[in-house]
Amino acid sequence: MADSFPNLLDGKALAQEMQADLTLQVQALQTRVGRPPGLAVLMVGDNPASAAYVRNKERACEQVGIASFGHHLPTETTQAELLTLINQLNQDPRVDGILVQLPLPNHLDARALLYAIDPTKDADGLHPENLGRLVRSEPGLRSCTPAGVMRLLQKYNIELRGKEAVVIGRSILVGKPLAMMLLEADATVTIAHSRSTDLAEIARRADILIAAVGKPGLVSAGMVKAGAVVVDVGINRVVEATGKSRLVGDVDFAAVQPIAGYITPVPGGIGPMTVAMLLDNTVCSFQQRNGLK
């Protein structure tokens, strides 16, 4: 796809590069410490999309040599049972990273579960201690999707200092931490959201425009300044008239791609980078916990 569109930010290719590097790192670390890094993934219920994401993460772990500890629990699992399991994983010396696959069934308190994870094993970078470290520009495990966006921009030498960056979306998963990372890179950052007045006018100011809402086709050509860098974090499954489904982002790719200076595709953009950063966080946690970093 990158050959067809020369202005693509190819997250899939960069993720493959990162995983090749991580494979070598893991081999060296296993030789030095006597075990590989380990990632525990907790999934509750039978959400098909979540199951697919978990399989993808487990497959990626296997490819780079990270030990994967899967915990697929029934929908009726209680909060107390999950907290007990997380505490056990916090104490397990084989486990360097813990991830709770979201969303969870409605009877579970996701925030309390995320808070229960040892911050040094917070592979998703969502514990308040790690988010606080981000705000203070201190070392810590970073949220995977925002960190993946930043790594991709860095790969393509996208200048951020002094640039206008607009993030559409204010979630704790993407929008807020990504805005902080852009600010740390000396961009001038605006966060837009569902209550923003005249979203199109705000978006058109952006040198770097990031859509992270989960609304197919939200960003149209009329919202993009010529030459802007457009990063599409949205992953939405839409059903076509034929009955077949396909993945699309929050950006109308066909309309925006000819205008943009750079643009990420969906799929093949930020999704693979999120998984690569999850692996990277797990390896970083392993190194820190073994006094190697």
UniProtKB/Swiss-Prot annotation:
One Gene Ontology biological process: tetrahydrofolate interconversion
A single cellular component GO annotation: cytosol
Coiled-coil region: none
Gene3D superfamilies noted in UniProt: Leucine Dehydrogenase, chain A, domain 1, NAD(P)-binding Rossmann-like Domain
Annotated EC: 1.5.1.5, 3.5.4.9
Known pathway: One-carbon metabolism; tetrahydrofolate interconversion
Binding site for NADP(+): G169, R170, S171, S194, I235
Molecular function in Gene Ontology: methenyltetrahydrofolate cyclohydrolase activity; methylenetetrahydrofolate dehydrogenase (NADP+) activity
Disulfide bond as UniProt keyword: no
Record key words, sorted: Amino-acid biosynthesis, Histidine biosynthesis, Hydrolase, Methionine biosynthesis, Multifunctional enzyme, NADP, One-carbon metabolism, Oxidoreductase, Purine biosynthesis
Family: Belongs to the tetrahydrofolate dehydrogenase/cyclohydrolase family.
Functional note: Catalyzes the oxidation of 5,10-methylenetetrahydrofolate to 5,10-methenyltetrahydrofolate and then the hydrolysis of 5,10-methenyltetrahydrofolate to 10-formyltetrahydrofolate.
Record-linked NCBIfam families: PRK10792.1, PRK14186.1
Protein name, entry field: Bifunctional protein FolD
Designated gene of the protein: folD
